[in-house]
Amino acid sequence: MARLVVVALLVLLCLSGLEAIQHAPKIQVYSRHPAENGKPNFLNCYVSGFHPSDIEVDLLKNGKKIEKVEHSDLSFSKDWSFYLLYYTEFTPNDKDEYACRVSDVTFTAPKTVKWDRNM
């Protein structure tokens, strides 16, 4: 019985320790298809490798939040880190700038990654 209690306490300690682990997210911004001015496309922001799961992701057009954005369900990898995909329809042109802004507990300030149409 004592052995069972010790094992249960060790399991609880290990599980509570998972919340203390923090991993900064990797942020990738890309379009679904190669960019062509005037041709509808999808802008994607893939955020991966982060822990804990509390995160805020915004897609931006010329520095302003895009309201009509969809996202995948929060999922986790084999290493228990999380990943998400945020996406929206957009039509690229030469004057507008697009980016993904991420707020996470591992950042002192939100991080913004610009979309590079040549990637």
From Swiss-Prot:
Classification via InterPro entries: B2Microglobulin, Ig-like_dom, Ig-like_dom_sf, Ig-like_fold, Ig_C1-set, MHC/Immunoglobulin
- Identify its protein family: Belongs to the beta-2-microglobulin family.
Give GO terms for biological process. antigen processing and presentation of peptide antigen via MHC class I; immune response
Q: Which residues form the signal peptide?
A: 1-20
Q: How does it assemble?
A: Heterodimer of an alpha chain and a beta chain. Beta-2-microglobulin is the beta-chain of major histocompatibility complex class I molecules.
Q: Does the keyword Secreted apply?
A: yes
Functional summary from the UniProt entry: Component of the class I major histocompatibility complex (MHC). Involved in the presentation of peptide antigens to the immune system.
- For this UniProt entry, what is the primary localization, expressed as one broad class? secreted
* Protein's name in the database: Beta-2-microglobulin
Please report any disulfide bonds recorded for this protein chain, giving both cysteine positions.
45-100
Taxonomic classification: Eukaryota, Metazoa, Chordata, Craniata, Vertebrata
Q: Which domain of life is it from?
A: Eukaryota
Tell me which UniProt keywords the record has, alphabetically.
Disulfide bond, Immunity, Immunoglobulin domain, MHC I, Secreted, Signal
Give the UniProt entry's GO cellular component terms.
extracellular region; MHC class I protein complex
Q: Where is the Ig-like C1-type domain?
A: 25-114
Pfam family for this entry, one: C1-set
Disulfide bond: present as a keyword of the record?
A: yes
Quote the subcellular location field of this record: Secreted
